Amino acid sequence: MGVRGRGMGVVAWACSLVFVMSSAVNAEQYELTESEVMDIAHFNTSDVSLFGIKIGDSEAKVKDNLIKIKIPGVKVEVQDVFVMLYDKRSPSNAMAGVRLLDGKVDYIFITQRFAHLAAGVFRLVLRGEGIEETRKLLGKEEFTEDSTTFTRLNYKGGTMVILFSGRDITVEFNAGV
């Protein structure tokens, strides 16, 4: 009975370890234009994509997915290290974009001009009324940066940032702080 009891304990321990490890591995892919994920705990920043582009993707993939392919209603411009996406209906300010650094994507952003294309929780954040509504949707931020011109709510160790600047809302995803 002693050996069998220890064996069952080892099996239970191994199963719990697999369960804990699988929750980190099973983070959902989050395509900003398609995914209906409503809880930020269900994805990692590295799993967020903008028209198929994720943090860490190569410049070649950015060219293939954003620059060469025509996205309906979207105008694409390359500005220095940024690939900016504009709404063709009113191309005054960028609605989304990525930054390339050393040939890889290290930053993705979307603004409230992107809300009509966004899905899931970020559609609600971009259409929201402000900081308190964002906190209701995403939960309490890990830390806040406040100044006279903007407020930054930092989530996921600072790799996901919600920036409020006047009436503008920007959601930023980055490789790390």
For each predicted feature, which ranges?
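Bacterial N-terminal signal peptides that target proteins for export
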Residues: 2-13
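Bacterial N-terminal signal peptides
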Residues: 12-20
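Boundary at the C-terminal end of the N-terminal hydrophobic targeting segment
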Residues: 25-27
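Short N-terminal segments immediately surrounding and downstream of signal-peptide cleavage
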Residues: 29-46
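Second-shell loop/turn segments in exported
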Residues: 47-53, 116-125
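A cross-family detector of function-defining hotspots
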Residues: 57-104, 124-177
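Mature extracytoplasmic domains of secretory-pathway proteins
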Residues: 104-107, 120
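Short, solvent-exposed aromatic-acidic interface loops
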Residues: 109-116, 175-177
